[in-house]
Amino acid sequence: MAEEMIPAWVEGVLQPVEKLEAHRKGLRHLAISVFVTRGNKVLLQQRALSKYHTPGLWANTCCTHPYWGEDAPTCAARRLGQELGIVGLKLRHMGQLEYRADVNNGMIEHEVVEVFTAEAPEGIEPQPDPEEVADTEWVRIDALRSEIHANPERFTPWLKIYIEQHRDMIFPPVTA
């Protein structure tokens, strides 16, 4: 894995830190998460088996860390293209959240996350990069929580946190 510098806080100062170091030390760092929807479904990805943490687990459509100096919307669009071959969707910023979770092998995600959604029209289908994504699946939003409860071992810690604690921010209830 090439050295990748991401924005992380060290002694209260935001500075470039190598990504693996941020995870090993559990440093608070910036991240983005994207949820691509189509009607009442959301696109999930199964992380590639070669990932250094949480391999093979199901996550939201796309999540990553911005490069040092990269803004969140640019990062979100870049990663949607790189991981899933999805380009040109209008990203909607839904808000910011923070979480901390053990992700295995002594790694900790302590992320300040900018959350985005995007609606994918019919005909837009993911073309996953196999180095990043093992599989994809469109899942009904209203069934996702019960699927996570029934099979928690299949899902990343952050997706469980997002759906349990931040579902209404990510998927606001429809009002008449």
From Swiss-Prot:
Protein name in UniProt: Isopentenyl-diphosphate Delta-isomerase
Database matches in NCBIfam families: IPP_isom_1, PRK03759.1
UniProt cofactor note: Binds 1 Mg(2+) ion per subunit. The magnesium ion binds only when substrate is bound. Binds 1 Mn(2+) ion per subunit.
Enzyme class: isomerase
Family indicated by similarity: Belongs to the IPP isomerase type 1 family.
SUPFAM superfamilies: Nudix
Annotated pathway: Isoprenoid biosynthesis; dimethylallyl diphosphate biosynthesis; dimethylallyl diphosphate from isopentenyl diphosphate: step 1/1; Porphyrin-containing compound metabolism; chlorophyll biosynthesis
Main location (coarse class): cytoplasm
Transmembrane segments: none
Cofactor field: Mg(2+); Mn(2+)
GO cellular component, as recorded: cytoplasm
Active site: 63, 111
Subcellular location: Cytoplasm
Domain Nudix hydrolase, residue spans: 27-161
Function of the protein: Catalyzes the 1,3-allylic rearrangement of the homoallylic substrate isopentenyl (IPP) to its highly electrophilic allylic isomer, dimethylallyl diphosphate (DMAPP).
Gene responsible for this protein: idi
Binding site for Mn(2+): 23, 29, 65, 109, 111
EC nos: 5.3.3.2
